[in-house]
Amino acid sequence: MSSDPRDVLLAPVISEKSYGLLDQNKYTFLVPPESNKTQIKIAVEKVFNVRVLDVNTINRQGKRKRTRRGWGQRKNTKRAIVTVAPGDRIDIFGPPVS
């Protein structure tokens, strides 16, 4: 894996569940399948300048989908749910809209 911490965090996950976890200081990111919890923690701390308390990872199996030429498969993904210290925030979704 590359030494650049920005290569570990591919994208934030935008879903109903991830929005619900924001109240608990938990942020969800897509990460490469070969990354581990230590790499994810270091990357979040360096990129966003926050203190990480906990990292939970989820390996998601790609769905089997029907195509014109038979069956295909979506790619497998890995997600990381990162808990940051109270008082720290990551503005990945922008400020709240009034």
Curated annotation (Swiss-Prot):
GO terms for biological process: translation. InterPro entries: Nucleotide-bd_a/b_plait_sf, Ribosomal_uL23-like, Ribosomal_uL23/eL15/eS24_sf. One of its GO terms (molecular function) is structural constituent of ribosome. Keywords: Ribonucleoprotein, Ribosomal protein, RNA-binding, rRNA-binding. GO terms for cellular component: ribonucleoprotein complex; ribosome. The keyword RNA-binding applies. It comes from the Bacteria. The keyword Ribosomal protein applies. Part of the 50S ribosomal subunit. Contacts protein L29, and trigger factor when it is bound to the ribosome. Belongs to the universal ribosomal protein uL23 family. One of the early assembly proteins it binds 23S rRNA. One of the proteins that surrounds the polypeptide exit tunnel on the outside of the ribosome. Forms the main docking site for trigger factor binding to the ribosome. This is Large ribosomal subunit protein uL23. The lineage of its organism: Bacteria, Bacillati, Actinomycetota, Actinomycetes, Acidothermales.
